[in-house]
Curated annotation (Swiss-Prot):
Alphabetic keyword roster: Aminoacyl-tRNA synthetase, ATP-binding, Cytoplasm, Ligase, Nucleotide-binding, Protein biosynthesis
Cited function: Catalyzes the attachment of proline to tRNA(Pro) in a two-step reaction: proline is first activated by ATP to form Pro-AMP and then transferred to the acceptor end of tRNA(Pro).
Name this protein carries in UniProt: Proline--tRNA ligase
EC primary class: ligase
Gene name as annotated: proS
A GO molecular function held by the record: proline-tRNA ligase activity
Lineage, highest ranks first: Bacteria, Bacillati, Mycoplasmatota, Mycoplasmoidales, Mycoplasmoidaceae
């Protein structure tokens, strides 16, 4: 077993402190003097770049083009859409002064960019021939969060926001669902995080949306994390910002809109779904180092460097890290465990005498002696095995933790066991708030299922099978 660094707190001791110690020890985040504003260190940014590259590739398959919007929005523009301004007003960072000049119309630092995209679309769309228009930007946004935690609630966070306009409601709504499917496929197949797809309740929708589609993931402590959302915005923004096109009937019509986003919050999900008490466990597809080549006292055995170079050349298709320092092998392994490297290759004199190296799997800690001639094929197979194993482990926990309930008492019991519940629910926002007071759980999403039953809270007949959980 590799050396365990003392600074990592175990999950059983305190899950929140464990999370923070993982973030710190894996060199993901550095705090600054401004609450909620954090440095994304190279390890974290490499994960985000891998996420960004794959999502961007998928978006392009659906005709989405990237652009960049300004950071500032005149406050007067926010006030054109009542629901939107009410939804974001408490979170706005404001620019009230430039130099020594006070502004009559202050600027808001974008918390999201619907308004910017609306003004852009208004200026470029004329007729139905211009539609659809699908754009995305990768940027940071700022929201004044009362309580901040790395990745989960940053005052400034990085994300992508996709905005698109269409001639019809059907097209816009279907594209919102398509993008949710893109997120679902990516999060499950690349990040190895099983998710639950569903529709947000009206009171949990994005401000100004008619529908909000979501994917919810379960963390190891039983809490849900909203991992990505896609919204059908209807014509609310189009009417507020006068986005019209000339239809085939030669009449002017308002466009139908959608938007969608996935943020660096997903890195928090990666940690809380996969990591253990030794550190990160990163899926091979997005690990910043997929393989670490660790020589054992190469300073005393120079031939190990020659073999390590041969291994590096043979595995050049992978993201590699090498450590040939005189640090002990236990320390080297512990550092790679913390940083979540899927496979470590130990290059030592004893093994090389038999033309072998030792592979150490991060997910199971298993050590495997491998002949050098079989190294490349074994690595390929192991990376696939690791990917499958960490997904199946998370999927098993999710499946075993969703319990159907018929009463508020059953819901209390399930939530107290750090599980999630599903129940037929046809209550109101006020009912949901009361349930949260009683159980600490709230509605996360409505399942996309056609069955019906009796609401566990109001006794009404309903087809809304709903997920309840504590949530981040």
């Amino acid at each position: 077993m590799a050396k365990k660094l003392e600074k990592i707190i175990t999950r059983n001791e305190n899950f929140a402190d464990w999370y923070t110690s993982i973030v710190n020890n894996a060199k993901l985040i550095q705090y600054t003097d401004i609450k909620g504003m954090m440095v994304f260190q190279p390890n974290a940014w490499a994960i985000w770049e891998a996420i960004k590259n794959q999502i961007d590739l998928e978006f392009k398959k659906h005709g989405v083009r990237n652009l960049a919007m300004p950071t500032l929005i005149p406050l007067s523009e926010f006030q054109k859409e009542k629901d939107h301004i009410e939804g974001f007003a408490p979170e706005l960072f404001m620019v009230n002064q430039i130099g020594d000049k006070k502004l009559d119309n202050p600027y808001a630092i974008r918390p999201t960019s619907e308004i910017l995209f609306c003004n852009y679309f208004k200026n470029i769309v004329n007729s139905y021939n211009d539609l659809p228009i699908k754009n995305n930007q990768w940027c940071s946004v700022m929201r004044a969060e009362k309580t901040t935690r790395p990745f989960l609630r940053n005052a400034e966070f990085h994300w992508q926001e996709l905005h698109a306009i269409f001639a019809s409601e059907h097209e816009a709504d279907e594209f919102a669902k398509t993008i949710l499917d893109v997120y679902t496929d990516f999060v499950q197949n690349y990040l190895c995080i099983p998710v639950i797809k569903g529709l947000k309740t009206p009171w949990e929708r994005f401000a100004g949306a008619q529908k909000t589609y979501t994917i919810e993931a379960m963390m190891q402590d039983g809490q849900a994390l909203q991992s990505a959302t896609s919204h059908y915005l209807g014509q609310f923004f189009a009417k507020a910002y006068d986005i019209k096109f000339q239809g085939q009937d030669n009449q002017m019509h308002y466009v139908h809109q959608m938007s969608a986003g996935l943020s660096t919050r997903i890195i928090g999900a990666l940690i809380m779904v996969h990591a253990d008490d030794q550190g990160l466990i990163l899926p091979p597809d997005i690990a910043f180092n997929q393989i670490a080549i660790l020589s054992i006292f190469a300073n005393k055995n120079p031939q190990l460097l020659t073999i390590s170079e041969q291994i590096r050349n043979e595995l050049s298709d992978y993201r590699l890290f090498e450590d040939h320092s005189d640090k002990g092998v236990g320390y080297k392994l512990a550092q790679q465990e913390i940083e979540g490297t899927p496979i470590c290759i130990l290059v030592g004199v004893k093994e090389l005498a038999n033309q072998q190296v030792v592979l150490v799997r991060r997910d199971t800690h298993e050590k495997i002696n491998v002949n050098l001639i079989d190294l490349k094929s074994t690595i390929k197979k192991l990376l696939l095995d690791i990917k499958t194993n960490i997904y199946q482990k998370a999927k098993k926990q999710l499946d075993e933790s969703i319990v159907f309930v018929n009463s508020i008492e059953e819901l209390k019991q399930v939530i107290a066991q750090n599980k999630m519940a599903k129940a037929f629910f046809d209550g109101s926002k006020e009912d949901d708030e009361q349930i949260k007071l009683l159980t600490n759980a709230s509605t996360r999403c409505i399942f996309d299922e056609t069955q019906s039953g009796q609401c566990f809270y109001t006794n009404k007949k309903t087809n809304k099978l709903t997920l309840f959980a504590r949530a981040y």
